Amino acid sequence: MVYATFNIDLSSKGSATGSAQLTGLPFASNGTTRGGGAVTYYHSTPALANCGGLLLLIEAADTNVTLRFYNSSTGLSADLTNSNFNNNTGYWGVLTYPI
């Protein structure tokens, strides 16, 4: 089992497209079980309507973490994208996954 904490503070968000991810974890997650975690603190983030929390998802057999937004109004979650960041956005969180 891997337990990790992280602290990411951007100085420039760039112009990436697609889902926001933390890539290159040192160990791949278990081939049959997902992992996850939570963003415990964030700052300088554009407003997220009905934000019920920011989640982390690691698919089975993966070394990438996808940052997700939970909408408390709809009960659905969606991946964060470039529009959910400013040049000085910061995220701190915790992550757990089986190997």
Placement of each model-derived feature along the sequence:
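Surface-exposed molecular-recognition determinants
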Residues: 1-99
